[in-house]
């Protein structure tokens, strides 16, 4: 596996967005709606402000560690022991989250298009793609991710626009939903919707411009775009569906566009969106494997990481 030492600012932002936004395609906004009710928009705005504030605070703290990722900082603070603990935790976390997301997405594909195919075979396709990408180069993964990220965000924006005719604005009432405590206190847990921004603290050592100013720019742009997409998706789902409706195993964003058509020859636009989302999840898994391999390289101090690729993909 050939490596790439440095990435540009826009490539770094694309890496963060693909990881943090992919959950929107599944059921993240729906989970917020079910738990919070009609005050979901207020809650999402609230947690978005908190996420932006926390990102600003962390960016300020990072000024003294320009060009260092979370493992370099851990080694500085607690030596190799803390570095290894943090590294193992991050690897386990990435594997756990990736496994859940890919499983959920493959379940959606199984229900919608491949009812006669066992979901394990669908998962295997994603794993094989990630394995091949890991053997080719990180450069290819990062460059491809930049294109897929643009298509993914564009597809989400079109999805939001298509939902406008189906919106019923009375569904925002009561504005406070189940009350202030549920919206602002209990709903504070939804700030973990931004946990994909963890990637932000893995990339400083990969940046072409490792200055604190550039890191701050990447952090703010990433969290703002993620916040905007989360707010828009929540607005679309709240105004298009009743908030008490639970749509199990099928992406609510898919249902938003499934009843739209463009003329006689393009009657199923959702198929095109699914294609983009499949590419997006493949890229997501490629990135997850890439970061795990980079972490393992730091922890075990080896130059050739290829022997880890197949066992990692099997996990």
Regions found by a protein language model. Name each.
Residues 8-27, 43, 47, 51, ...:
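Hydrophobic, membrane-embedded alpha-helices of multi-pass small-molecule transporters
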Residues 77-89, 148-163, 223-231, 313:
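Small-residue-rich segments of transmembrane alpha-helices in multi-pass membrane proteins
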Residues 90-93, 229-241, 267-313:
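Alpha-helical transmembrane segments of helical membrane proteins, especially in multi-pass transport
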Residues 72-75, 102-120, 208-213, 217-229, ...:
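Helix-loop-helix connectors at the membrane interface of multi-pass transporters/channels
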